[in-house]
A protein has these predicted regions:
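Active-site beta-to-alpha loop of glycosyltransferases that engages the nucleotide-sugar donor
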Residues: 11
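A structure-centric signal for secondary-structure junctions around beta-strands
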Residues: 2-3, 25, 103, 148-151
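Amphipathic alpha-helical segments in well-structured domains
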Residues: 25, 33-34, 61, 121-126
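Conserved beta-strand scaffold positions in the cores of enzyme catalytic domains, especially
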Residues: 28, 78-79, 137-139
Length: 171
């Protein structure tokens, strides 16, 4: 079964100052001929993925639809977040969509991450896709070296996630 990518695209995306503005989050900034959301949409065109779900808010809806059209993604679902409440509620609201089969794996991706080695990205997904069951979750990313108020992160024990820390406050 193909993985259903869920692109989290509702955040303010302000950590690329001075390029970000109130009306334009970093996932929508035009870097000449590409945007971070555009790169994310291109990544999920790989054969291992099903039609994407984009979790966003009403403020970004027009820009999301423009990107879907530009990248020729015709089959998709958009989930509008009722209020901006961080990552976990966006994941939960998307995971509760009724027409997603229970056995279909979901992969949550940030709209504003730059992944340059797409081949390695897809290889890591394929390798771990075989290990997925309805009882587990596969996550991967850059291992944090210290707590940061810029990023949320997972705590693990014996390859199991024990807790998610949402962008901790600076000490």
């Amino acid at each position: 079964m193909k993985i259903r990518p869920v692109i989290l695209c509702g955040g303010a995306g302000t950590r690329l100052w001075p390029n970000t503005k109130k009306h334009q989050a970093k996932q929508f900034i035009d870097f000449g001929n590409w945007t971070l959301l555009g790169k994310t949409l291109e990544r999920v065109k790989a054969s291992i993925f099903d039609a994407p779900i984009i979790s966003t808010n009403a403020k970004y809806l027009r820009q999301v639809k423009q990107h879907l059209k530009k990248h020729k993604i015709r089959k998709f679902k958009i989930v509008l977040e009722p209020a901006k409440r961080n990552t976990a509620p966006a994941i939960l609201s998307t995971a509760l969509i009724e027409d997603i089969p229970n056995e279909q794996p979901l992969m949550f991706l940030a709209a504003d991450h730059l992944i340059e080695k797409v081949g390695l990205f897809n290889k890591a997904i394929k390798k771990n896709q075989k290990k997925l069951t309805h009882n587990n979750i596969f996550i991967f990313g850059i291992k944090p070296t210290m707590p940061s108020s810029e990023f949320g992160y997972f705590l693990t024990k014996n390859i199991k996630v024990t807790k998610f820390i949402e962008k901790p406050k600076q000490a």
